[in-house]
Amino acid sequence: RQRQMCIRDRALLQKCAVPLLAAAMPRAVWLLADTPALTEAGILPGEDVHKHLAGCGQAILLAVTLGPGVDAQIRRAGVGDIAAGVASDALGSALAEQAADAAEAQLRQWAATEGKYLTGRFSPGYGDWDIAVQPLVAAALDTVRKAGLCVTDTNLMTPRKSVTALLGVSDHPVKGQLAGCGHCVLRTRCEYRKRGKTCASE
């Protein structure tokens, strides 16, 4: 029975993936800036983001979106089929992370040619880097014009399947602060963890 469920789940994911991939139009925009300038602009509040940028004189702001077509396809998939809607939403989140990974890989290639080193990605909502900075990040990157990415009054991104992040830039090897539940100030009262999930999986 468990094997049958796995086969059925795999078939559902494959069925949902085809139209989702067809609807995706990934776009990425990034900006290299001095960290003091970002701090002065109010983009780097909190301690955790500064720990992540320790030893970095510059940082890269990055935004990646799959475009509105993916959001629309997720809605269509869920009409009359809750399982397909949930599967499509999960696939969309995974696809957005893959697009962010691809953009990061390009940035690492650029850094290598410049003799620079990058930290990993650190996104608004990690640790005490409040998602309230999303409008400032979007404005600095001009995401509305360059990528069609907007931020709502409640600091949510539209299209939903989008990622914003920051990477530290240094002249010497750096790791940055590891992201994840173990480093999150909300880990002891996180509603996602109570349900056996993480915010990254939503």
Feature names for model-found ranges:
Residues 2-7:
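Short, small-residue-biased leader/transition segments that mark boundaries at the very start
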Residues 114-192, 202:
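Short terminal or interdomain "cap/linker" segment that borders an active site or interface and mediates
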Residues 17-24, 107, 111, 185-188:
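Structural signal for hydrophobic packing residues in well-ordered secondary-structure cores
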Residues 8-17:
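Active-site bordering "gate/hinge" segments
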Residues 8, 26-32, 107-122, 195:
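Flexible, glycine/charged-enriched surface loops at secondary-structure junctions
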Residues 19-84:
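A glycine-rich, hydrophobic loop/mini-helix early in the fold
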Residues 56-123:
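Conserved mixed alpha/beta catalytic, RNA-binding, or beta-rich assembly cores of soluble enzyme
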